[in-house]
C-alpha cells in the first residue's frame, strides 16, 4: 500500500494487508451572542515597550510637504522605492525626527520605521509615555504587547475558541476548557519534551474538592476522576528512550502497541522507538492539536508564528502508540492487530474521546471500525479522518455511523504574492516568504537544468536535476507532482536559487509547507500563467509576504485533497463525511528528530482536521459529561456552518463537507439532538445485509437516526423518520427545502414540555423535477427556544 504521509505525492487508501496509513498531507501535493461593542476607555500606561508614531508621512505616502525634501510617494501603478536618493534623504530626516522625539523623554529608539509607518519602537515608563502622547509632532503612543492572531490563520481563533467572547471564556477560561475529560490519541506516540505537553509532575495525593479532576499515581497506575463520574486508570509504560516517568498532569497515560510491527519488521529494519516516544511527528502534531497546552510560543526555522493552543487545553491526554516507521516504511504505518490492542486498552482505561487519524476502508465491516462500535457503546466519542484521496467522488473511508468522519477545510492562509516584472500579481500560499524576496530573474526549471537531466524530471525540480551555474540567484518555477514538495525547494536551494514558485498545472490544493527557500505556491490559473511568463528571456519576479492581488482568499473551503462521499459501503444511504474542520497548513508540535529538528511544523491532511473535532468533543463533554457520543456528534453537526465555494458563496455540497464546518461556539445548546446507540447501529447493519446475530430488526439504512438524511436511490417517493430529543423545552417549527423535490415534515411543529423528552417526525421526499442520477442537496431545520438545528439532506433520484 502507499502511505498517506506528509511527504508523498499522492496516496491510495488500502487495508488489505492489515496496515493503516496516517492521514497527513503536511507536505503532500491539500455562538455565544456577541454583545454590542462598548468603546473602551484608554488604559493607563504601564512600563514596557511602545510604538511611537509621528505625524510626518512615511516614505510610501510622502508628497513633498517638507521644504527641501522631494516627494517619495510613487506614481500610480509604480512601486515604492526606498533605494532612491530622495527616499534615503527623507528616511534620514524621519529618523532624525524620531530620535529627537525619543530624546525629549530620555528614551532611545530600539527600531525605526519609515516606509509604511513613521515611528519607532522604544521602552518607556508610564510617565514617559504620557509625556510623549502630549508632545508636538507625535500622533500616538501605543503599547507594543503581543497580539493574538485575529486574521483566522490560527484555527483556534477561526473556531471562535479564543478571545473575550470565545468558547473558552464562556466556559470560565482555558483552565476549564475540557476539564475532567480524557482524550485518547491512537497514533505514532508523542514527544514528551514538547512545551505543548509540559505540566506538573504527578503526585500520590488524592484530589481535593478544589480540584477534583487532579490526576495522581497509585503504584504503577495513574488515576483521574472524570467529569462523567467515572475514573480513568492508565499507565506510563517504559521503553526505548522513555523511562516511564515522562507522564505528568497533562499526559496521564502513554503506552506502546508494537507486537505485530515487531513480528513483521526485522530488528535491522526498525527505525522507530519501541516505546511511546514519537519517531515520526504525526502523533505529536495530532495530540497537541486536540488537547495541547494553551499559549505555547511556536517558531519555525527562526520565524515566530505567535502562540498555539490545543482545542481543549484543559483536557488530559492518553497516548496509545500504534504507528511505527521502518527502513521500508519511512512514514509511520499502523498494523490492525496493534490498533485493536490499543482500542481495547483505551476502552479499559476509560478515555472519553479517541482520535484516529489513520486510514481504513470504505466498507462497513472493517475490523478497526467494528472495534470502534465497542468504544462508542462504552460512551467514547471517536473522531476519524475521512482520507486524502479527494477531490473525486466516493473516495472516503470510515463510513460506519458510530464514528465521526472528518473532512479538511481551510483557514485564512499565510499568503504570499508573486509580483512579475510585467506588473501582474498572483497570490498563493507563502508560509516561508517574509517581507520581500527579489527582484530576481524568474526562470523555468527546465531552462536551468543540468545537461544530463531529463526535461520532465527537471520540470518537477527532482533531486540533482538543476544546474548551479544556471540557477544561482534566480527564482525557479517548479511543477507540482511526483517529487515531495519540500524536496523541490531543497533542490532549488542546493543550486543557489533565491526562491521558488511552485505551480499547480491542474486544480489542486495549495499548501503551507516549510520550504528550504522562500516559496509561493500557486493554483490554476495563476500557476500556468506564471510559468508561461517565466519562459521569456528577461522575465523577473519578486516574492512578497501577504496578498497584494485583487483576488481575495475565500475561506473556509474544503481542501481539494479531502476525500468525498458518497459512501460506497452504504450505497449512499448514510452521509459521509459527517463534518469538516481545519486541516490545511495547521501549525502544531512535532518530534524534532524526524522533522529536521523543528519543534513545530505545518502539516496538512484530514489527519489534522480530525483532532480538531476530537478536541471539540472534549469541550462538549466538559459541559455535558453525561451525553452519549452520538448526542455530541449531533450537536456538532446540526450547529455547523456551510463552507464556501471559490466564488465566496456558501456551498451545499454535503458530500464534501458533511454538515459543514464545525462551530463549537454554537454546539452547547443545539435545541434538539438526534441520538442513537448500539441497537440502532445493529439495526442499521442488518438493513445493509449483515448478519449481526443480535436479534434486532433490520431498518432501511436511510431510517437510521442520524443527524443527516441520505437516500442513495430515491425512486418516486420515500418517507424517513427521525427521533428528536429536546435539549431545551419549547415549540420547534420545522422547515425543509430540497430543490426539485417536494418535501414535507410531519408534524410541522414539535412541542417539548421538558428537556430529555423525545418526539418522532416523518420526512417525506417526492421527486418533482430533480435531475436523475445526480446528488441533490437540501436541509431540514428545527427552530425553537432560541435555537436552530440544521440537518443536511442528500438525495439521488433514480427512475427505478
Predicted regions and their residues:
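Inhibitory N-terminal propeptides of secreted protease zymogens
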Residues: 35-150, 728
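Substrate-binding/access-modulating region of protease and related hydrolase catalytic domains
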Residues: 177, 193, 278, 319-408, ...
Amino acid at each position: 500500500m502507499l502511505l498517506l504521509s506528509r511527504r508523498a505525492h499522492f496516496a491510495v487508501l488500502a487495508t488489505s494487508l492489515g496496515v493503516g496509513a496516517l492521514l497527513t498531507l503536511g507536505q503532500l501535493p491539500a455562538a455565544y451572542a456577541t454583545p454590542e461593542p462598548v468603546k473602551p476607555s484608554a488604559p493607563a500606561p504601564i512600563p514596557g515597550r511602545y510604538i511611537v508614531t509621528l505625524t510626518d508621512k512615511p516614505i510610501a505616502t510622502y508628497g513633498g510637504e517638507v521644504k527641501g525634501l522631494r516627494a517619495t510617494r510613487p506614481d500610480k501603478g509604480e512601486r515604492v522605492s526606498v533605494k532612491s536618493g530622495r527616499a534615503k534623504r527623507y528616511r534620514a530626516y524621519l529618523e532624525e525626527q524620531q530620535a529627537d522625539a525619543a530624546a525629549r523623554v530620555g528614551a532611545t529608539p530600539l527600531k525605526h520605521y519609515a516606509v509604511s509607518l513613521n515611528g519607532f519602537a522604544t521602552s518607556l515608563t508610564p510617565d514617559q509615555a504620557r509625556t510623549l502622547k502630549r508632545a508636538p509632532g507625535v500622533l500616538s503612543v501605543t503599547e507594543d504587547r503581543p497580539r493574538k492572531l485575529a486574521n483566522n490563520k490560527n484555527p483556534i481563533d477561526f473556531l471562535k475558541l479564543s478571545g473575550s467572547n470565545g468558547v473558552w471564556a464562556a466556559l470560565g477560561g482555558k483552565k476549564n476548557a475540557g476539564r475532567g475529560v480524557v482524550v485518547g490519541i491512537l497514533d505514532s506516540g508523542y514527544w514528551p519534551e514538547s512545551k505543548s505537553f509540559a505540566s506538573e509532575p504527578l503526585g500520590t495525593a488524592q484530589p481535593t474538592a478544589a480540584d477534583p479532576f487532579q490526576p495522581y499515581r497509585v503504584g504503577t497506575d495513574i488515576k483521574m476522576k472524570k467529569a462523567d463520574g467515572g475514573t480513568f486508570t492508565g499507565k506510563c509504560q517504559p521503553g526505548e528512550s522513555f523511562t516511564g516517568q515522562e507522564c505528568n498532569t497533562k499526559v496521564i497515560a502513554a503506552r506502546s502497541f508494537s507486537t505485530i510491527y515487531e513480528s513483521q519488521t526485522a530488528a535491522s529494519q526498525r527505525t522507530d522507538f519501541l516505546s511511546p516516544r514519537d519517531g515520526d511527528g504525526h502523533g505529536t502534531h495530532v495530540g497537541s492539536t486536540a488537547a495541547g497546552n494553551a499559549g505555547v510560543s511556536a517558531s519555525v526555522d527562526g520565524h515566530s508564528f505567535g502562540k498555539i493552543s490545543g482545542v481543549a487545553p484543559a483536557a488530559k491526554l492518553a497516548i496509545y502508540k500504534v504507528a511505527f516507521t521502518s527502513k521500508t516504511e519511512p512514514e509511520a504505518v499502523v498494523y490492525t492487530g496493534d490498533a485493536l490492542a490499543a482500542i481495547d486498552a483505551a476502552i479499559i482505561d476509560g478515555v472519553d474521546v479517541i482520535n484516529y487519524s489513520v486510514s481504513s476502508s470504505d466498507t462497513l465491516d472493517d475490523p478497526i471500525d467494528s472495534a470502534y462500535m465497542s468504544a462508542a457503546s462504552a460512551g467514547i466519542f471517536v473522531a476519524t479522518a475521512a482520507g486524502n484521496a479527494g477531490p473525486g467522488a466516493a473516495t472516503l473511508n470510515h463510513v460506519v455511523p458510530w464514528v465521526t468522519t472528518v473532512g479538511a477545510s481551510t483557514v485564512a492562509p499565510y499568503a504570499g504574492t508573486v509580483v512579475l516584472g510585467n506588473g501582474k500579481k498572483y497570490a498563493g500560499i507563502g508560509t516561508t516568504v517574509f517581507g520581500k524576496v527579489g527582484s530576481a530573474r524568474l526562470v523555468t526549471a527546465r531552462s536551468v537544468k543540468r545537461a544530463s537531466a531529463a526535461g520532465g524530471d527537471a520540470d518537477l525540480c527532482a533531486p540533482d536535476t538543476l544546474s548551479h551555474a544556471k540557477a544561482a540567484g534566480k527564482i525557479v518555477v517548479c511543477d507540482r507532482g511526483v517529487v515531495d514538495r519540500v524536496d523541490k525547494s531543497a533542490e532549488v536551494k542546493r543550486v543557489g536559487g533565491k526562491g521558488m514558485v511552485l505551480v499547480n498545472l491542474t486544480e489542486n490544493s495549495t499548501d503551507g509547507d516549510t520550504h528550504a527557500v522562500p516559496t509561493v505556491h500557486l493554483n490554476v490559473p495563476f500557476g500556468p500563467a506564471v510559468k508561461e511568463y517565466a519562459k521569456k528571456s528577461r522575465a523577473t519576479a519578486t516574492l512578497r509576504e501577504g496578498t497584494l492581488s485583487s483576488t481575495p482568499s475565500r475561506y473556509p473551503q474544503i481542501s481539494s485533497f479531502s476525500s468525498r462521499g458518497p459512501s460506497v459501503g452504504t450505497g449512499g444511504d448514510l452521509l459521509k463525511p459527517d463534518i469538516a474542520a481545519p486541516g490545511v497548513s495547521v501549525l502544531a508540535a512535532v518530534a524534532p528528530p524526524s522533522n529536521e529538528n523543528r519543534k513545530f511544523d505545518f502539516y496538512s491532511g484530514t489527519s489534522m482536521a480530525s483532532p480538531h473535532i476530537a478536541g471539540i468533543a472534549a469541550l462538549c463533554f466538559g459541559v455535558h459529561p453525561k451525553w452519549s457520543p452520538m448526542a455530541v456528534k449531533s450537536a456538532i453537526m446540526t450547529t455547523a456552518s456551510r463552507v464556501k465555494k471559490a466564488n465566496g458563496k456558501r456551498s451545499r455540497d454535503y458530500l464534501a463537507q458533511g454538515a459543514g464546518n464545525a462551530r463549537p461556539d454554537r454546539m452547547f445548546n443545539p435545541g434538539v439532538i438526534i441520538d442513537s446507540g448500539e441497537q440502532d447501529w445493529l439495526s442499521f447493519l442488518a438493513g445493509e445485509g449483515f448478519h449481526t446475530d443480535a436479534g434486532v430488526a433490520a431498518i432501511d439504512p436511510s431510517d437510521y437516526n442520524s443527524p443527516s438524511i441520505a437516500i442513495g436511490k430515491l425512486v418516486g417517493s420515500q418517507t424517513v423518520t427521525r427521533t428528536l430529543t429536546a435539549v431545551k423545552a419549547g415549540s420547534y417549527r420545522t422547515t425543509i427545502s430540497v430543490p426539485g423535490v417536494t418535501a414535507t415534515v410531519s408534524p410541522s411543529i414539535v412541542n417539548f414540555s421538558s428537556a430529555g423528552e423525545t418526539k418522532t417526525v416523518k420526512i417525506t421526499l417526492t421527486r418533482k423535477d430533480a435531475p436523475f442520477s445526480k446528488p441533490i442537496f437540501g436541509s431540514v431545520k428545527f427552530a425553537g427556544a432560541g435555537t436552530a438545528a440544521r440537518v443536511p439532506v442528500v438525495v439521488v433520484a433514480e427512475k427505478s
